[in-house]
Regions:
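Glycine-rich phosphate/adenosyl-contacting loop at the front of the ribokinase-like
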Residues: 1-71, 96, 113
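Short beta-strand segments
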Residues: 6, 81, 102-105
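A common structural microfeature
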Residues: 48-49, 84-86, 100
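Short glycine-rich, polar/acidic loop-and-turn segments at beta strand-coil junctions
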Residues: 53-57, 79-82, 93, 107
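A glycine-rich helix N-cap at a beta->alpha junction
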Residues: 65-84
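Short beta-strand scaffold segments in enzyme catalytic cores
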Residues: 87-91
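Conserved phosphate-binding/catalytic loop of the ribokinase/pfkB sugar-kinase fold
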Residues: 92-113
C-alpha cells in the first residue's frame, strides 16, 4: 500500500502548557499539518508515504524536508517556492481553557501552488 498526502505543512509556534499567547515571551517550534501528521503515523506502520506540497526555498523549507524525510516520507513531489512557509500559533490549553490556533498562511508557498 502507498499513501500520498496533499496539503500544507506549516511552522508551528506553540506556547508552554498553561500560557496564553499574551503571556508568552517565547515559543516552542515544530512543524505540523493534518496530512503530514497522518503520513507520519502511517510511516510508523511501515506504509510507504509521500507528501505533495510546497514550502519556502529557505532554511525553514529545507528543515521541513529534513523533518519529513526523518519519518521516511517521500518528498519527491514537494516543491520549493519563493513564497513563505505558512505559520500557525498554538496556544496550548490548560484545565478548562481549550487550546487556540491562529493561522498566518496568506500568500504562503502552498497557497501559491
Amino acid at each position: 500500500m502507498k499513501v500520498a498526502g496533499f496539503g500544507e505543512i506549516m511552522l508551528r509556534l506553540s506556547t508552554d502548557v498553561g500560557k496564553m499567547i499574551l503571556q508568552s515571551d517565547r515559543f516552542n517550534v515544530n512543524y505540523g499539518g493534518g496530512e503530514a501528521n497522518v503520513l507520519i503515523s502511517l510511516s510508523h506502520f511501515g506504509i510507504d508515504t509521500k507528501m505533495i506540497t510546497s514550502v519556502s526555498n529557505d532554511d525553514i523549507g529545507k528543515s521541513i524536508l529534513r523533518y519529513l524525510r526523518s519519518y521516511d516520507i517521500d518528498t519527491e513531489f514537494v516543491t520549493l517556492s519563493d513564497h513563505r512557509t505558512g505559520i500557525y500559533y498554538l496556544q496550548v490549553g490548560s484545565g478548562i481553557r481549550s487550546s487556540k490556533v491562529i493561522y498566518d498562511r496568506d500568500n504562503s508557498a502552498f497557497c501559491n501552488m
